[in-house]
């Protein structure tokens, strides 16, 4: 087992990994930028190393500084968390070259599944259902035109190196294809340094349902049930739940089998997520695979009583998995609390937290790195907390979430707590009747000024 793990991340996920390491008797090293000197992950780790100024490119994305921090502290493994370098094949390879275990996917696996067109071709070979469209990179606009006609409108153009909704364009008519092709490629080039595109049939108003998988060094994989991540804004998830209110036992079995087939076909090692689009007829199609821990992993942990970070560490240390597939016995919901103003177009709201009162009670979990007196830097993602409720039924989990959101007080900055509180009362949400288009019609009501 590892003696010391460096966490190449910040915020709540760094703290989350530190907590599991402490329980496992593993020493921890936090890395931080000068903007994060007062963050809780720095205070809770056994050692902490400053790796640069606030800009991510000079700190959390600066591979040489992170490797140097691992070497001077004698860390024998690095946990990348999510975001930053978690799906960076080059970083995974450099860790390998320095005899430091990367607690994540191998460089080859990241390359294979990180390139969306490659991943789709791999899944077709594995016999996993995929959205109709191109089977690889589109070589030029002429091929794009031909493919769109064959696939049938509407189509979705996607950046092969994409993520976070960048380089994606929905095209409903042939006359709009050229503009979409040009703008998607430009956006992709600017964001990823790569303008390769592929095309898929646009699945209208789908559910976004992902399956959590774990694979080990023996080539065996299992699934830990689904998460419904359909409520999104600009392709960014806002809230997630398990089980999905749209799920049936038969569909879970099929999707779980497909996800395990995908993981075993590529001999996947570690925790990963196979993401699917599910249409209104419950046909499901592979979308992508994330070769890292997900932001929303706690809801899976809650319903199957399983520490996914611990499992990541064990698998990285070559401990075989049990191979058992899991079905949720409880219902869990997560609300991502962001430092954003929901009444002002979700504009970021960094600054100093003057008051913080956290909710508590049975079935409430709060993963956060912030506290009263903490200043949220403007340099990073705006998520400051994940509020999770767990209960016997969906109705009870929603009731708990309403109560917890009412109890949750953060002052000094704007947060998305009021948005989530309104969401929990929305009739379509209460009925479990929502798709990825839900936020297009959701109107946030401003409170009446007293």
What are these regions (language model features)?
Residues 110-113, 123, 156, 168, ...:
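Methionine-biased hydrophobic packing positions in alpha-helices, especially
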Residues 146-156:
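Acidic/histidine-enriched active-site and ligand-binding environments that engage anionic O-linkages
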Residues 1-126, 138-146, 396:
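ATP-binding N-terminal substructure of ATP-dependent carboxylate-amine bond-forming enzymes
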Residues 38-39, 87-88, 113, 140-142, ...:
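Short secondary-structure boundary/hinge segments and terminal tails
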Residues 7-23, 48-50, 71-73, 96, ...:
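ATP-dependent carboxylate activation and anion-phosphoryl transfer catalytic cores
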Residues 159:
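N-terminal nucleotide-binding beta1-loop-alpha1 segment
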Residues 133-134:
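Conserved beta3 strand of the protein kinase N-lobe
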């Amino acid at each position: 087992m590892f003696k010391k793990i460096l966490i190449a991340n910040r915020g709540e996920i760094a703290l989350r990994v530190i907590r599991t390491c402490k329980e496992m008797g593993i020493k921890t090293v936090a890395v931080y930028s000068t903007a994060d000197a007062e963050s809780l992950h720095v205070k809770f780790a056994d050692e902490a190393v400053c790796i640069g100024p606030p800009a991510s490119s000079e700190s959390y994305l600066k591979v040489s500084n992170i490797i140097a921090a691992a070497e001077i502290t004698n860390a024998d493994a690095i946990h990348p968390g999510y975001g930053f370098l978690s799906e960076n094949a080059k970083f995974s390879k450099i860790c390998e070259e320095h005899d430091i275990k990367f607690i994540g996917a191998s460089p080859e696996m990241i390359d294979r599944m990180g390139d969306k067109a490659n991943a789709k071709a791999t899944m077709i070979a594995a016999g996993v259902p995929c959205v109709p469209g191109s089977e690889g990179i589109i070589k030029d606009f002429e091929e794009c035109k031909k493919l769109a006609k064959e696939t049938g409108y509407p189509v979705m153009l996607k950046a092969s190196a994409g993520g976070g909704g960048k380089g994606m364009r929905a095209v409903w008519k042939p006359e709009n294809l050229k503009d979409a092709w040009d703008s998607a490629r430009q956006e992709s080039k600017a964001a990823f340094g790569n303008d390769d595109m592929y095309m898929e049939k646009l699945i209208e108003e789908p559910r976004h349902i992902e399956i959590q998988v774990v694979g080990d060094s023996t080539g065996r994989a299992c699934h830990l049930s689904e998460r419904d991540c359909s409520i999104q804004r600009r392709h960014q998830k806002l809230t997630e739940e398990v089980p999905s209110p749209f799920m049936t036992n038969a569909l879970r079995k099929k999707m779980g089998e497909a996800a395990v087939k995908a993981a075993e076909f590529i001999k996947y090692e570690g925790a990963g997520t196979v993401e699917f689009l599910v249409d209104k007829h419950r046909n499901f199609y592979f979308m992508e695979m994330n070769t890292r821990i997900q932001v929303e992993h706690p809801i899976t942990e809650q319903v199957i009583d399983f520490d996914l970070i611990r499992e990541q560490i064990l698998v990285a240390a070559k401990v075989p998995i049990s191979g058992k597939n899991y079905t949720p016995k409880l219902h869990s919901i997560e609300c991502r609390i962001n430092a954003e103003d929901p009444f002002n177009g979700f504009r970021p709201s960094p600054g100093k937290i003057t008051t913080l009162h956290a909710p508590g009670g049975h079935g409430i979990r709060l993963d956060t790195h912030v506290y009263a007196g903490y200043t949220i830097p403007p340099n990073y993602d705006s998520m400051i907390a994940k509020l999770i409720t767990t209960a016997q039924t969906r109705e009870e989990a929603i009731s708990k979430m309403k109560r917890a959101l009412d109890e949750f007080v953060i002052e000094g900055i704007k947060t998305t707590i009021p948005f989530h509180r309104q969401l929990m009362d929305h009739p379509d949400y209460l009925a479990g009747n929502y798709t990825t288009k839900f936020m297009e019609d959701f109107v946030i009501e401003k409170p009446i000024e007293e």
